[in-house]
Regions:
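Short, basic-rich loop-to-helix N-cap that marks the start of a DNA-contacting helix
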Residues: 39-51
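Alpha-helical residues within the helix-turn-helix
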Residues: 12, 23, 51
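Recognition helix of helix-turn-helix/homeodomain-like DNA-binding domains
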Residues: 26-41
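Short C-terminal boundary/hinge segments that cap the last helix of small helical domains
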Residues: 54-67
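Residues in the helix-turn-helix
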Residues: 20, 31, 59
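A short, Lys/Arg-rich alpha-helix, primarily the initiator
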Residues: 1-20
Length: 67
């Protein structure tokens, strides 16, 4: 299972809000919802997030085993 929990933690730690992601990073509100609900997000969007914040993919996404 894919989880964006690492990025949600990063957002809290760095005081990043929804409006910043939409307006400064350029992601859509639909993508923001997907990130919060651990739904699939396109790889080019994940790359955009990594490049904007200068963070490795491991700070955006993690894979958890399904139980």
């Amino acid at each position: 299972m894919i989880s964006y929990k690492p990025f949600r933690h990063y957002m809290v730690e760095h005081d990043i809000d929804r409006d910043y992601l939409l307006n400064e990073v350029g992601i859509s509100s639909t993508t923001f919802t997907k990130l919060n609900q651990d739904k699939p997000v396109r790889m080019d969007i994940l790359e955009k997030i990594c490049l904007h914040f200068k963070i490795p993919i491991e700070q955006v996404i993690e894979i958890k085993e399904n139980h």
